[in-house]
Swiss-Prot record:
Location in the cell: Cell membrane
Pfam families registered for this protein in UniProt: 7tm_4 (PF13853)
Name by which UniProt lists this protein: Olfactory receptor 5T18
Keywords attached to this entry: Cell membrane, Disulfide bond, G-protein coupled receptor, Glycoprotein, Membrane, Olfaction, Receptor, Sensory transduction, Transducer, Transmembrane, Transmembrane helix
Protein purpose: Potential odorant receptor.
Organism from which the protein derives: Mus musculus
GO cellular component terms, semicolon-separated: membrane; plasma membrane
Transmembrane portions of the chain: 23-43, 44-64, 98-118, 140-160, 195-215, 235-255, 270-290
Family: Belongs to the G-protein coupled receptor 1 family.
Length: 325
């Protein structure tokens, strides 16, 4: 990476300078972060621990949960420290690392959501051949390709952004080191960077949304051919959750990055950015759990196992007390 900038660190201004409001926001985002970790890690443990969820659909879901947990962890802890500290400094390379990880996880999630839509199409269109069509030789490369695409996309923007000069200011009016607010404080010509951002985000969004739309068009045709109302209900329960997640995530990404720079508003975009980087990772486990019968049944099985284990331990303790002289 070619560092020609005069800045050796950046100051993340965050959401507010009001001390009382910062305490409230600290508690709010701490609760959101804890809930995000519990929800996503819990979903991963559930998928790994329940044999009935050992299929490609839930493998994708567990990977999505890991991406969401990492995405939130890349941004939230640093923001929490900023709320409680007078110094909101992040080093030059710390800022570059944060941007690289944020773009990696954000892009990976886009590709994963598209892969999950294709997986749903295969499962519903030809359920008898699902195990063959979506074998580990198919879905594991899809997961690897999603991560690879995210990493390549992140490298392009990280190198392009941090090759700029930041002699104008080192104050970033944002909650983390995102591309648009950094371009806003650069004293270099940013036309190429803006073009790269628009082109790559537009291309990735267009390709992944097209995959989702085509997959769900075929899914809809399959639903119309179904005679069983129970089968339709199950399809809607699994696909409804995914469609909700796709709509929320892709909608916010398009709003943030695919538009003219003249419409860029730091304050407004900071709120939207906070939602898709911190809010969505918290919402995804809720969306996929509440709308998915298999996940809810797996939760019940886990709870029953825990209750049975506790009951057996109690019986053993009672028996040992009985045997004691």
């Amino acid at each position: 990476m070619r560092n020609i900038t005069e800045a050796t660190f950046f100051v993340l201004k965050g959401l507010t300078d009001n001390n009382e409001l910062q305490i409230i926001l600290f508690l709010l985002f701490l609760a959101i972060y804890i809930f995000t970790l519990i929800g996503n890690v819990g979903l991963i443990i559930l998928v790994v621990g329940d044999s009935q969820l050992h299929n490609p659909m839930y493998c994708f879901l567990s990977v999505l949960s890991s991406v969401d947990a990492c995405y939130s962890t890349d941004i939230t802890p640093n923001m929490l420290v900023g709320f409680m500290s007078k110094s909101k400094i992040i080093s030059f390379y710390g800022c570059a690392t944060q941007m690289f990880l944020a773009v990696t996880f954000g892009t990976t999630e886009c590709f994963l959501l598209a892969a999950m839509a294709y997986d749903r199409y295969v499962a519903i269109h030809d359920p008898l051949l699902y195990a063959v069509s979506m074998s580990p030789r198919v879905y594991i490369p899809l997961i690897i390709a999603s991560y690879a695409g995210g990493i390549v996309h992140a490298i392009i923007h990280t190198v392009a952004t941090f090759s700029l000069s930041f002699c104008r200011s080192n104050e970033v009016k944002h909650i983390f080191c995102d591309i648009p607010p950094l371009l806003a404080i650069s004293c270099s010509e940013t036309y190429v960077n803006e073009l790269l951002l628009f082109f790559f985000v537009s291309f990735i969004e267009l390709v992944t949304i097209l995959i989702v739309l085509v997959s769900y068009a075929f899914i809809l045709l399959s639903i119309l051919k179904m005679n069983s109302s129970e089968g339709r209900r199950k399809v809607f329960s699994t696909c409804g959750a995914h469609l909700t997640a796709v709509s929320i995530y892709y909608g916010t990404i398009l709003f943030m990055y695919v538009r003219p720079s003249s419409n860029y508003s730091l304050e407004h975009d900071m709120i939207v950015s906070t939602f898709y980087t911190i809010g969505i990772p918290m919402l995804n486990p809720i969306i996929y759990s509440l709308r998915n019968k298999d996940v809810k049944e797996a939760m019940k099985r886990v709870l029953r196992k825990k209750i049975n284990i506790k009951h057996r331990i109690k019986k053993l303790n009672d028996f040992s007390v009985f045997l004691m002289p």
